[in-house]
Amino acid sequence: MTIVEDAQKGIITEEMKIVAKDEGLDPEFIRRGVAAGRIVIPTSPYRQVKICGIGEGLRTKVNASIGVSSDIVDADMEVKKAQAAEAAGADTLMELGTGGDFLAIRKKVIDSISLSVGSVPLYQAFIEAARKYGSIVDMTEDELFKATEDQAKLGTNFMAIHTGINNITMDRLKAHGRYGGLCSRGGAFMTSWMLHNEKENPLYANFDYLVEILKEHEVVLSTGNGMRAGAVHDATDRAQIQELIINSELADRAHKQGVQVIVEGPGHVPLDQIGTNVKLMKEMSGHKPFYMLGPLVTDIAPGYDHIVTAIGASVSASYGCDFLCYVTPAEHLALPNLEDVITGVKTSKIAAHVGDMVKYPDRAREQDLAMGRARRDLDWQKMYSLAIDPEHAKEVRNSRAPEDSDACTMCGNFCALKIVNQNYNLAK
């Protein structure tokens, strides 16, 4: 039985107990969430992974994406990025390579970390077709499903699969047009294949067969967002919503067959539309875990898109988004390097926490309360221990060391907190 089927039979599995302990919640709450499709717990029969729950009532989780490109193929560097992402606090990792030996590189990455690892199988299928036949449009349907199964057997825990692109979605896209084009690589591959071959998307047409593969290998389905906007002016358009409707219907079908499902959301969304997107997705999908790719709230800050994303991600999480894909400073410019990956994870972890302070004020604000008291008391060691990045905080302070060890060089002898502590008591 799958974990969904266990949960629906009233069985609390070891994975549910681990999530409950990690979140400080009752195991029965986790079981009910998995049974209803509101919580997923990625696992694999092929490898031991760090158990992580994603969904309603749980802390907002952060995914880091890595992977070689056709221009830069350095498997060892991708392993270092994966390990750095885990060390920086990423909850999951997606390996999205589009160059080199797909399975060999992915296996190397999977074997190097304990996190759940996700992938996009159609990248491999389409790019191998281009290598073999000279064009992505010559890929066969069998090759697409074989790539999916091959990646599942490696121990891939969740897969972004572009199930919601079909002929109806395509009609909406062509009729409405786009200011920023189609930014999803998977969406670009699949729509090009459909138009050239005059056929339906095989992932949609053969959805039940796809679900059989995922169920056999205990892979979480993440319904790919191939119609997401690549510019804020295209956000929440007809093609995006059409795909969401289809993916929500397919998510229900997969869950009824015992497969865990995450529904993916958009990546470029102006701030005033974030709440609408989260609420709409949650209602349409029956409150399945919602995964947002960023989101970016403006398009004019290349080089600073990790900051743009932190703004959007914190608001998304506050409205109920469960799962955030990080964005690095290299977004829209280059393949991220090691430092970009670390910065992306840290920035998104901050955003997730900020959102959780709104979603779960009783639970998520305890660390901030402790930090406030530590600052009041000028307890620097306590401040470091509570910081999201203790080593960075120490490094910054020590690089400009104060004469007075109680204060910092911002205020020096005129530290407001020290003055108050010397003259009266504000402890609470």
Swiss-Prot record:
Which keywords label this protein?
4Fe-4S, Iron, Iron-sulfur, Lyase, Metal-binding, S-adenosyl-L-methionine, Thiamine biosynthesis, Zinc
Report the co-factor binding details.
Binds 1 [4Fe-4S] cluster per subunit. The cluster is coordinated with 3 cysteines and an exchangeable S-adenosyl-L-methionine.
Q: What sort of enzyme, by top EC class, is this?
A: lyase
Catalytic activity reads:
5-amino-1-(5-phospho-beta-D-ribosyl)imidazole + S-adenosyl-L-methionine = 4-amino-2-methyl-5-(phosphooxymethyl)pyrimidine + CO + 5'-deoxyadenosine + formate + L-methionine + 3 H(+)
The protein's annotated pathway = Cofactor biosynthesis; thiamine diphosphate biosynthesis
Point out the signal peptide segment.
none
List residues binding [4Fe-4S] cluster.
C408, C411, C415
Pfam family of the protein (one):
ThiC_Rad_SAM
Q: What is its EC number?
A: 4.1.99.17
Source taxon at top rank: Archaea
Annotated GO biological processes are: thiamine biosynthetic process; thiamine diphosphate biosynthetic process
What are the GO MF terms of this UniProt record? 4 iron, 4 sulfur cluster binding; carbon-carbon lyase activity; zinc ion binding
Q: Where does substrate bind?
A: M94, Y123, H162, S184, R185, G186, N225, G226, M227, R228, E264, Y291
Can the keyword Lipoprotein be found in this entry's annotation?
no
Cofactor(s) needed, names only, are: [4Fe-4S] cluster
Residue positions annotated to bind Zn(2+) are: H268, H332
User: What is the stated purpose of this protein?
Assistant: Catalyzes the synthesis of the hydroxymethylpyrimidine phosphate (HMP-P) moiety of thiamine from aminoimidazole ribotide (AIR) in a radical S-adenosyl-L-methionine (SAM)-dependent reaction.
Q: Which NCBIfam families match?
A: PRK13352.1 (NF009895), thiC (TIGR00190)
Q: Which family does it belong to?
A: Belongs to the ThiC family.
Protein's name in the database: Phosphomethylpyrimidine synthase 1
What organism, scientifically named, is this protein from? Answer: Methanosarcina barkeri (strain Fusaro / DSM 804)
